[in-house]
């Protein structure tokens, strides 16, 4: 859709956009951003359309007491359960659709056709979330108490890594295909900590390399955010950085894709400027 702004013609992309628990109409400068916002808004509308199912799951979703205890430092269990439900609505109903519904009737018929598996999706995601939080909680304990100064560089790198893997809202923010890999990433951190006393120097070299790669990613991500861009190649690079960490610190766990510094560099060349 063309619009004139200050005598300049520009193309804008209409989409629904989430606003609290409701949605409104919005316009975006790129189709990727419009698609992303529209999809999140549809999750919210599905929560309203399938209100009975959502209410049932809020009260019956297994493991909520334990989830609440493990998530306590990050937020309220109610928020976590909402995120699990929204992400489950996405994976159960919206995932795999070539085009997303643009009207209420289209969304209603899609929901009716695919809602049968919602409980299964939500229970599976709750279990994955519990596994992730147990591993995360175990790692948090390692930072309490006296820290060996020789290991400080590695521990700072790990803390920073963890803050970008597990944070308030991570269940909904992390793409489903990568969320299921989080337990492996966290186990690789455990292995790194176990080996650390015997390879402090080696670890320091890797930490420096990873810090450079991450800074490069963050700078580009910030630039894209400012421009309203969403680049799938940059997102892929971000998760390949986690795979690269596994290849350095937890080789026995294996990687989802063959990975090396050369492959990372090649992927970076595909990222939008």
Where are these regions (language model features)?
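C-terminal amphipathic alpha-helical interaction region
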Residues: 139, 146-273
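Short, small-residue-biased leader/transition segments that mark boundaries at the very start
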Residues: 1-5
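Noncatalytic, helix-rich "gating/capping" subdomain that lines the substrate-entry/channel surface
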Residues: 6, 10-147
């Amino acid at each position: 859709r063309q619009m004139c702004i200050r005598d300049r013609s520009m193309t804008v992309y209409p989409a629904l956009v989430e606003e609290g628990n409701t949605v409104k109409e919005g316009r975006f400068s790129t189709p990727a951003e419009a698609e992303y916002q529209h999809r999140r808004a549809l999750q919210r509308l599905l929560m309203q359309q399938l209100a009975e199912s959502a209410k049932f799951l809020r009260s019956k979703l297994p493991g909520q007491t334990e989830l609440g205890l493990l998530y306590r430092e990050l937020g309220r269990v109610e928020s976590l359960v909402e995120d699990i439900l929204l992400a489950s609505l996405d994976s159960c109903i919206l995932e795999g659709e070539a085009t997303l519904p643009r009207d209420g009737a289209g969304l209603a018929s899609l929901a009716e056709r695919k809602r049968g598996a919602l409980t299964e999706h939500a229970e599976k995601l709750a279990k994955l979330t519990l596994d992730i939080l147990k591993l995360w909680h175990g790692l948090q304990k390692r930072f309490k108490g006296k820290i060996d100064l020789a290991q400080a560089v590695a521990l700072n790198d790990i803390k920073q890594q963890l803050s970008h893997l597990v944070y308030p809202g991570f269940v909904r923010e992390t793409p489903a295909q990568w969320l299921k890999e989080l337990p492996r990433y966290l186990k690789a951190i455990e292995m790194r900590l176990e080996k650390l006393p015997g390879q402090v120097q080696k670890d320091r070299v890797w930490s420096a390399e990873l810090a450079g790669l991450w800074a490069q990613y963050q700078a580009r991500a910030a630039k894209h955010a400012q421009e309203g861009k969403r680049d799938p190649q940059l997102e892929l690079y971000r998760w390949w950085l986690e795979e690269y960490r596994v290849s350095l610190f937890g080789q026995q766990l294996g990687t989802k894709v063959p990975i090396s510094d050369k492959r990372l560099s090649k992927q970076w060349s595909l990222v939008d400027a």
